[in-house]
Amino acid sequence: MESRKTFDSIPDDLFVEIALRLSSKSIARCRCVSKLWASILYRQDFTELFITKSSARPRLLFAVLKASGLIFYSSPQSQNPSLEVDFHNHMKFHEDMNLYMCSYVSGFDPIGKQHKVLCMNKRLNKEWVHYILTLGTENLKWRKMICPLTHEPYYGRALSINGVLYYFARTSCFLVVSFNVRSEKFKFLDGKDFSNFHREFINYKGKLGVTKLECDAGDGHPRELCVWVLEDVEKQEWSQYIYSLPKIKVNRIRNDNIFAMFLPLTI
């Protein structure tokens, strides 16, 4: 009993300082030591401090898809990277998923201070279903969602801005999907102007921006850059800017997933 009393009598500020130096896996283990430790390590202020500290020593995260779920591995990101990786977590799919094809996007709720993962998967019967996972909770569990419009996530990088997650999708037409991470509600914006492969989302001063690169039909060189900025989500009002690009010599590498241009160092 005396050892237990000494064990739990560590001052909170000292305990937090020590815990901030641990790995996330060690933090999870410490939460099981005692109710007192769990109450401290589950606090929102500790989570924010831990994320801030961890971001100063970033790690690369790898996910391997297996029949039973996703297996995560991580490796320190340093100037002299090692090929060694650590086993991080094994997360099973929801038993109802019955996967044929799946896509994952993540977003952050700045009010609730929560990271969430949105999973969209195509089942064997060709039906698209949606699941949501809230990270940092005691019981990591996928929750099935009801989406008002069946849609297929489309080629392109998702972007999270001020608690709203944006990604491209298509039904019978091309869409920009807006997903509120906190309320978990969908909105669908007309995306017909962006329906080609040369476009990306950008964060334009806290607003959603979409860039679209137009290329010459003859030689394939970039001709102009179009930038749309979403001014009003409810009214679907966009402002548009068009920049004409000078015709310069470029070398391009392109395949189904990569499009890169090598430009002169001085312009």
UniProtKB/Swiss-Prot annotation:
Q: Which InterPro entries match?
A: F-box-assoc_dom_typ3, F-box-assoc_interact_dom, F-box-like_dom_sf, F-box_dom
Q: Where is the F-box domain?
A: 4-53
Q: Which Pfam families match?
A: F-box (PF00646), FBA_3 (PF08268)
Q: Which NCBIfam families match?
A: F_box_assoc_1 (TIGR01640)
What is the designated name of this protein? Putative F-box protein At5g38810
